[in-house]
Amino acid sequence: MKKYNRIFTIVIDSLGIGGMPDSMEYGDKGVDTLGHIAESVEKFNIPNLEKLGISNLHPIKHVKAAEKPLAHYMKMKEASVGKDTMTGHWEMMGLHITKPFQTFTDTGFPQELLDELTKRTGHNIVGNKSASGTEILDELGEHQMKTGDMIVYTSADSVLQICGHEETFGLDELYRCCEIARELTLKDEWKVGRVIARPYLGSKKGEFKRTSNRHDYALKPYGSTALNTLKDNGFDVISVGKISDIFDGEGITESNKSKSSVHGMEQTLEIMDKDFKGLCFVNLVDFDALWGHRRNPVGYAEEIEKFDIKLGKVLEKLKEDDLLIITADHGNDPTYVGSDHTREFVPFIAYSPSMKENGLMDTVDSFATIGATIADNFELKMPENTIGKSVLEKLV
């Protein structure tokens, strides 16, 4: 018998809680996204995360351990190889990624790929290096507006990103070019996890801003996930933010794009008013995109505080047969060197108004605990060749 009719899983993108045992192998010595954020500010007001037990799970400055935490909580290790968005989310829903997605961080993309992209799109290409979005626009935004050239760049992730000015290049044209790039990068030697359309507005260097019309063209998951199992058995799988893009729409019954993390939480609150049975799967990307990669711990702290305010409203709306799970997909310590993700434990914080118990659970060896627990709740078997063990029976 189902314990919960609705499960809300919220991914605070990149909110790691300390380096994993193998983090040194990824160049991530001493990382701690949440801990170092708290140490970087004079005050850190997150009363709702506090009462759920965030500082009981991972003691941090300015935030007290709750005497009677409301939630069950534990740390999750990443079983897969990698520390990127797709690996983290795919593992949550049961996939074990044993071969990391290919990156072009140090080399840029092969000339043969760029030549083919130019031939197919009709646009010359500039950039072709690893850079932050703000840097590449400051450097090449004006040039692109004048010439119609495509800005192509990458990052520490397995991504090919294309920038286009919404007014001079055009959104439809940008999407067309990205679809061609996605087709080309399905070849093994050029394969990337995602092609990302990065539209922007503004008229000169220093004023360019990326817009919310971003679109991700992801690889399809390598196998069936918990999302497919839910959908195939008639349950709702409602996505918020970039979840649908990450899974290339696989297993999703309703997709809601977000303009910001605050907007994503507002969408979640609206979905809570709906009568559905199944999963609402939320990704809040601003933590990672605006603050983690840009190494801004103060901005990151403020974003968490904004989230906490909305979280309070979510807690008020939860029904007795609702379950809330708060987690993350990787770390991105904004005090660490470089601009890359960091290999960290992530939180598993589970709460329902019907829970009679609470407290610390043993660390688990995979993010896939989430997908397995969700499937178990709806009395479904996880697909073949997936990983993860349910902790549903402990959520009492």
Curated annotation (Swiss-Prot):
Specify the superkingdom: Bacteria
Q: List locations, semicolon-separated.
A: Cytoplasm
Question: What is the primary gene name for this protein?
Answer: deoB
Please report the name of this protein according to its UniProt entry: Phosphopentomutase
Organism expressing this protein natively: Clostridium botulinum (strain Eklund 17B / Type B)
User: Which reaction(s) does its UniProt entry say it catalyses?
Assistant: 2-deoxy-alpha-D-ribose 1-phosphate = 2-deoxy-D-ribose 5-phosphate; alpha-D-ribose 1-phosphate = D-ribose 5-phosphate
Q: Does the keyword Manganese apply?
A: yes
Keywords (alphabetical) are: Cytoplasm, Isomerase, Manganese, Metal-binding
- Function description: Isomerase that catalyzes the conversion of deoxy-ribose 1-phosphate (dRib-1-P) and ribose 1-phosphate (Rib-1-P) to deoxy-ribose 5-phosphate (dRib-5-P) and ribose 5-phosphate (Rib-5-P), respectively.
Q: Chief localization class?
A: cytoplasm
Give one Pfam family.
Answer: Metalloenzyme
Would you identify the family this protein belongs to, as annotated? Belongs to the phosphopentomutase family.
Which BP terms from GO are recorded?
2-deoxyribose 1-phosphate catabolic process; 5-phosphoribose 1-diphosphate biosynthetic process; metabolic compound salvage; nucleotide metabolic process
Q: HAMAP family from the xrefs?
A: Phosphopentomut (MF_00740)
GO cellular component, alphabetical, reads: cytosol
